[in-house]
Amino acid sequence: MRMTSSMAALCVLLLAQPLLAQGWTEYENRVDRFTVPAPGEPKVETITWDSEYGAKFPGRVYRWEQGRTRYSVTVVDYSDAERIHSELGHIAYQGGPGYWTIDIMASIDYAAMLYRQKPGVKVTYDAWHYIERVTGHELQLTNSDDSRSYVGIYLHENRLYVLDATAARNEAPPIIFQQSFGFLDAEGKPVQYRDFYFNRLPPPRLKRP
């Protein structure tokens, strides 16, 4: 039986109540434009994300831990993809304006592939998904140590968001972390879409010969 949207909302609400009692708060980040319920302030790491087509994009990882459960949000900024690809110098990218756009459009699938290819991982759920009407992909995996990972991957305003909640064996599924994730606009306000959102590519800026 498929769960209706009202039933799903009720489940999220019921799951959120004990988390609030455990000291969870709504973490808001206006730099990377997201909000998520989390156990306190995260540890933040600046990263370089290696893309499918050999480009390096700036990003940050936000990490939390509570007991034997780990949570993270990875945000990768693809908005400057055209310039980054133009500086690669590889013959495959010279004069080829399509590669930077492909790198953005394929970013969700590529991130999902990285999870599927982890050593010892068994994928138990692998399907299209959306949160706040922003389209993406959902994965559930059993890891080599029998822990369980619940992963959501979304692309919004040319930022890639990878949500990962990993719980040890026999721990409760930490699905509230993903299901209550939200996106913010440039002014820090929650985005609300009436229709499903599909990422729009940034306009080309570089002159072509």
Predicted regions and their residues:
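Short, solvent-exposed coil/turn segments at beta-strand boundaries
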Residues: 37-41, 66-70, 134, 154-161, ...
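N-terminal signal peptide c-region/cleavage motif recognized by signal peptidases
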Residues: 16-18
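Bacterial N-terminal signal peptides that target proteins for export
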Residues: 1-8
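Solvent-exposed coil/turn segments that connect beta secondary-structure elements
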Residues: 32, 67, 78, 144-146, ...
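Surface-exposed amphipathic alpha-helical segments
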Residues: 30, 42, 92-96, 100-101, ...
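N-terminal targeting signals for Sec/Tat export/insertion, comprising classic cleavable signal peptides
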Residues: 30-55
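Conserved polar/disulfide-associated segments of primarily extracytoplasmic proteins
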Residues: 50-148
